[in-house]
Amino acid sequence: MKKKELNFTPKRDKNTKIPRPRNAASLVLLKRSGKDVQVLLGKRSDKTRFMPGAWVFPGGVVDKADYTISINTSLNKNIIKKLAVSNNIGTANALAIASIRETVEETGLILGKKSKNVLTVNFEEDNNGIAIMSKLGLEPDLTKLFYLGRAITPTISPIRFHARFFITDAKHLTGKIKTTNELVEIEWISLKSAKKLQMADVTEFMINELLTFNGDILKIKKMLVNRPMFTWKMGKQWITRK
């Protein structure tokens, strides 16, 4: 059955100001299952304001606390150059931390390493991903992250993000999958089958990007010179590579 075409981008009132995109990050989790490569996707609640009912990678907006966390690892300098952060290490690491934190909060899965220090950042919620990791004696492990691409929500939307998509191998994860208020269903699904799900154009684009590498993380790591930026301009998909 052909999947129904849905538009997950809300429309902005033309009389309102174009909002500036907020920094955001997603974590693409991959694992090999026999000859297939599977990706973890979650279905957003129908009650959410942005992309209700869409299947997405875990992720979300960068919080202020993500900028202030002191950890013992950092992103690879070659990845930092690709993130459009003017080589700002602090911003780059905050994006990476956000992707890991959101994954903990939305799925229960943790990409962490033993921490030598107790993280002392004040969190507003007990279920904050970094707070959960800290209680387990863990901190985000940025060395296990690779970079897939980035995307900017088009100007027609009243809610805009500048999202960076990181990748990691599921073998580095701990924890057990659990659904949340944000992701009401979570599944490991083959890359080819994933495209049959209802998803936003940017999610499908990133999955197609993964398929060009057969989901091979090491191949993606070697192709840092050709990473995409996805957006829309004048009603058409606009993709640049750098």
Question: Where do the model's predicted regions map?
Answer:
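N-terminal leader/linker segments that precede catalytic domains of diphosphate-processing enzymes
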Residues: 1-242
